[in-house]
Amino acid sequence: MKVITFSRRSALASIVATCLMSTPALAATAQAPQKLQIPTLSYDDHSVMLVWDTPEDTSNITDYQIYQNGQLIGLASQNNDKNSPAKPYISAFYKSDAANFHHRIVLQNAKVDGLKAGTDYQFTVRTVYADGTTSNDSNTVTTTTTAVPKVINITQYGAKGDGTTLNTSAIQKAIDACPTGCRIDVPAGVFKTGALWLKSDMTLNLLQGATLLGSDNAADYPDAYKIYSYVSQVRPASLLNAIDKNSSAVGTFKNIRIVGKGIIDGNGWKRSADAKDELGNTLPQYVKSDNSKVSKDGILAKNQVAAAVATGMDTKTAYSQRRSSLVTLRGVQNAYIADVTIRNPANHGIMFLESENVVENSVIHQTFNANNGDGVEFGNSQNIMVFNSVFDTGDDSINFAAGMGQDAQKQEPSQNAWLFNNFFRHGHGAVVLGSHTGAGIVDVLAENNVITQNDVGLRAKSAPAIGGGAHGIVFRNSAMKNLAKQAVIVTLSYADNNGTIDYTPAKVPARFYDFTVKNVTVQDSTGSNPAIEITGDSSKDIWHSQFIFSNMKLSGVSPTSISDLSDSQFNNLTFSNLRSGSSPWKFGTVKNVTVDGKTVTP
């Protein structure tokens, strides 16, 4: 099957062109779905994923019809009920919205299962409107399912799922024996293991009931990589790795899939009391800790820090640099992670570094409240999709990074990302840009997401010395509720308490520009953080610019705090039930900024 990739820049350009050539009414009621496609590696011998663009205005759209070989096979909503772990939480969110306050998202994906191996299929999609009419067909996607792969079960090489046997060698032998296109099956059971090394052209499949449990022995995670070539610190391997010490270039590895209904557990921290989620399901929770308490709260985290300190490393550096993440894929061209549950990393969850054409679909992230327990991070990577996932994370949920300081100018930006149909619970931020912004974070579209209990909806953070920044950011058609802090923060005052990376300060300071936030509802936040907070450093001529906020409803939030901003607009933002003060607007030093067409005078 041909791998289909995409450019969000071209997709956005297409939407803009359509709006320019059509009246708003026609665009809202008659447009067929655009850019129907199959995400990278999201297919196998019996199924295929479909995703498509939605227009900027989705207010008149109720669903999408899915057609296979010209025959209607169902609705996107019904399909997501069956296949998306995010959908039940999204449905519960709207069920509780009795006042109909929130923006209604639309579902723009479907999984077609029950297909025959090695068989040609054609797919189209139609929009369903509120009046019951439908659009014309989308573009047609023609594809061929793969052949049935060779399957190797790790128990064939002696792996034992008893929760105590160390299976590193047995599982690695199974991976090494896997021919091109092979699938490695992990059956039901708890398979304890140290670092494993994936290779090109393979699928790792964790069956229902399977758990890969990280060893708690620091020696089982050898030195593996530097986060950037220009830093001195070396990090240990993750539990699952595609890393080559001699090359981080895109294409060093190709075509890696990690799929299945099983669990990847990093064994990083002790558990605290479990919680119940919105559906009544048990949620594992982990002890909130830091570098001063890791010896008491950690498992693998404790042992890795202790091992590093024993060699003479100071505790802060050991804590920052010597804890393993769960999954690190570096230099990979074409990667797909789907359906697995991610738990309890000693450090971060999933990391895609210097990779392209990477997709996360229907992953459940359960890392709350593990310190630094990000959900998924994209570092200097391009052509990214994240959809249908559920995030309950100890740090940022989806994070973009792009190097630090002057040397980052030699790196590629993180670019072309599309984030949609996700459900975000706890986290320090749902969609996060930075703090490592050196090479730039460019062209990110986050749409049709639901966010609740997270600290921040859209979080852009850096510091002048890091350089770069982010631009071409669109955050739209989403709903937020019960935020711990605020809806949006853009700041150059970020400082990482655990940060020990050595880098040369950038000659050109970081800044953020060309942001669009549109068609978003925000209901209730705790604390006193401004609902929208924007700060640069105008005293040093560091301005953010070209921000457009429009069509937002905010209730039960604190007033805004906006400074160091130029050439920007705030249109049709309605506030109710302010937590403090009588005016929602608080401006510092700004220039050429308007609210509903009126120039702001600080």
Swiss-Prot record:
The gene coding this protein = pehX
Catalytic activity field: [(1->4)-alpha-D-galacturonosyl](n) + H2O = alpha-D-galacturonosyl-(1->4)-D-galacturonate + [(1->4)-alpha-D-galacturonosyl](n-2)
Q: What is this protein called?
A: Exo-poly-alpha-D-galacturonosidase
Main function: Contributes significantly to bacterial utilization of polygalacturonate and the induction of pectate lyase in the presence of extracellular pectic polymers.
Which CDD domains does the entry link to?
FN3 (cd00063)
Check the record and name the SUPFAM superfamilies matching this protein.
Answer: Fibronectin type III (SSF49265), Pectin lyase-like (SSF51126)
Sorted alphabetically, which PANTHER family does this protein's record hold? PECTIN LYASE-RELATED, PLASMIN AND FIBRONECTIN-BINDING PROTEIN A
Name the PROSITE patterns for this protein. FN3, POLYGALACTURONASE
SMART domains from the xrefs? FN3 (SM00060)
Provide the species name. Dickeya chrysanthemi (Pectobacterium chrysanthemi)
